[in-house]
Amino acid sequence: MDQAKLARMQQSVRIGGKGTPRRKVKKVHKSSGADDKKLQATLKKMNVQPIQAIEEVNMFKEDGNVIHFGAPKVHASVPSNTFALYGNGEEKELTELVPGILNQLGPDSLASLRKLAESYQNMQKNQAGADGKKDDEEDDIPDLVEGENFESNVE
């Protein structure tokens, strides 16, 4: 082939370099809205029903923490043993929820609560012992060296 003809063909299909427009790459972002729609459609097929008047939901984890949902929306399908919770979950320690959560605790959670109470009492004893030692050390006044009188040095 002729070199001039080849150069003209290359110039017409030039992709990059000086003087060529930039090509924008189209990026497709997958939104979470599509996932929510799929989930809603699946739940609708399972014939879930809303459950009213649920004030809070607590899920107990193995490490002793609790996932707490305040005023969630709850849907359930009893025949398929499926429950859906909608809301913002917060991870909290068991001690933060203790007064109102005692009637919800099962045997496993009660055991972890006992362990937590024992460790808390031990921490209190250790702190009290350490505070007592610090007070004794601060109250100690160093003894004066025999034969020295500091009052005479002041004058």
Curated annotation (Swiss-Prot):
Q: Where in the cell is it found?
A: Cytoplasm; Nucleus
Q: Which domain of life is it from?
A: Eukaryota
Gene Ontology CC annotations of this record: nascent polypeptide-associated complex; nucleus
Looking up Pfam families in the UniProt record yields:
NAC
Q: Per the record's keyword annotation, is NAD included, yes or no?
A: no
Q: What sequence ranges are listed for the domain NAC-A/B?
A: 33-98
Disordered: annotated segments: 1-35, 116-155
GO biological process annotation, one example: protein transport
Q: Where is the composition biased (Acidic residues)?
A: 136-155
InterPro entries xref list: BTF3, NAC_A/B_dom_sf, Nas_poly-pep-assoc_cplx_dom
The annotated regions of Basic residues compositional bias extend over 20-30
The record ties this protein, via Gene3D superfamilies, to: Nascent polypeptide-associated complex domain (2.20.70.30)
- Keywords per UniProt: Cytoplasm, Nucleus, Protein transport, Repressor, Transcription, Transcription regulation, Transport
Role noted for this protein: Component of the nascent polypeptide-associated complex (NAC), a dynamic component of the ribosomal exit tunnel, protecting the emerging polypeptides from interaction with other cytoplasmic proteins to ensure appropriate nascent protein targeting. The NAC complex also promotes mitochondrial protein import by enhancing productive ribosome interactions with the outer mitochondrial membrane and blocks the inappropriate interaction of ribosomes translating non-secretory nascent polypeptides with translocation sites in the membrane of the endoplasmic reticulum.
Family listed: Belongs to the NAC-beta family.
PANTHER family in the record, alphabetically? TRANSCRIPTION FACTOR BTF3 FAMILY MEMBER
Q: How does it assemble?
A: Part of the nascent polypeptide-associated complex (NAC), consisting of egd2 and egd1. NAC associates with ribosomes via egd1.
Q: What is this protein called?
A: Nascent polypeptide-associated complex subunit beta
- Source species, please? Aspergillus niger (strain ATCC MYA-4892 / CBS 513.88 / FGSC A1513)
Q: Which gene encodes it?
A: egd1
